[in-house]
Amino acid sequence: MEPILAPNPNRFVIFPIQYYDIWNMYKKAEASFWTVEEVDISKDINDWNKLTPDEKYFIKHVLAFFAASDGIVNENLAERFCTEVQITEARCFYGFQMAIENIHSEMYSLLIDTYVKDSNEKNYLFNAIETMPCVKKKADWAQKWIHDSAGYGERLIAFAAVEGIFFSGSFASIFWLKKRGLMPGLTFSNELISRDEGLHCDFACLMFKHLLYPPSEETVRSIITDAVSIEQEFLTAALPVKLIGMNCEMMKTYIEFVADRLISELGFKKIYNVTNPFDFMENISLEGKTNFFEKRVGEYQKMGVMSQEDNHFSLDVDF
């Protein structure tokens, strides 16, 4: 039995902290909280109306995938991870992650609602898991892992792949629009969401390091390469990025680059050994590490949450 999954009678009380590295991840997530009301999408409509039909088609399908996927991640957290993991610090993170995923889902739904005026098309996009085969394939893969009988370690890798690989190419495609100076609301929300997902992915890697009996390297490689092939097919065949003027072969390479970064973070050898083909993704590539986080995307970070000085109470102060 993994220690982090073992029955823990102290799980209802936060202090004393036992796992400081996990607790610090929770505080980092807390410091980056945001809401959809803080994203101004009013200027997007002018840009939206100037996009080509292909560009609109691409963005709508990407948003449809995103709108559904956060709910799938949350279902896994609610049904599996939150009940399995018994250490309080990780439960704090997972609870906060669920709130953040709801905000992501609301943001994507609001973007669809703003850009798409036809109610039938809206319904089609909101029900992408049933209506779009390319989205269904990714959703089915993620949902399969919620109900899989595999151990926590394997499912941890699968959902790290969902958040680290299944989202990566779509994030890159929206950053490509930012490079062109288009859709400021969409691209700003993409910065916030990609930062959050990078942190969630880092958290999965941290939890993996706490396992005493992790899955084998062969198992990890199998899950990650499976996710890579599905994501490559999604963005080069089902919903090709050439629709927005991106190079499909470079996108394939980028997804492999992101997968290598993930598997390295898990402590294993790289699979693809490729370099990042997108210079504009240099600081983003779902690294989720402090260098990206501390940029405080859009200068946004909750005041004082990460400030250590505020946490000390002294009776020596002159009142």
Curated annotation (Swiss-Prot):
Family per similarity comment: Belongs to the ribonucleoside diphosphate reductase small chain family.
Function: Ribonucleoside-diphosphate reductase holoenzyme provides the precursors necessary for viral DNA synthesis. Allows virus growth in non-dividing cells. Catalyzes the biosynthesis of deoxyribonucleotides from the corresponding ribonucleotides.
GO biological process: deoxyribonucleotide biosynthetic process
InterPro entries named among the record's database cross-references: Ferritin-like_SF, RNR-like, RNR_small, RNR_small_AS, RNR_small_fam
Any Pfam family hit: Ribonuc_red_sm
Positions of Fe cation 2 binding: 101, 163, 197, 200
Textual note on the cofactor: Binds 2 iron ions per subunit.
Active-site residues, Swiss-Prot/TrEMBL: 108
The keyword Lipid metabolism appears for this protein: no
Enzyme Commission (EC) number: 1.17.4.1
GO MF terms held by the record: metal ion binding; ribonucleoside-diphosphate reductase activity, thioredoxin disulfide as acceptor
Induction field: Expressed early in the viral replicative cycle.
The entry's keywords: Deoxyribonucleotide synthesis, Early protein, Iron, Metal-binding, Oxidoreductase
Interaction with R1, as annotated region: 313-319
Subunit structure: Interacts with RNR1/OPG080 subunit. Can interact with host RNR1 supunit.
Cofactor(s) of this protein: Fe cation
Protein name: Ribonucleoside-diphosphate reductase small chain
Binding positions (Fe cation 1): 70, 101, 104
Organism: Vaccinia virus (strain Copenhagen) (VACV)
Reaction equations catalysed: a 2'-deoxyribonucleoside 5'-diphosphate + [thioredoxin]-disulfide + H2O = a ribonucleoside 5'-diphosphate + [thioredoxin]-dithiol
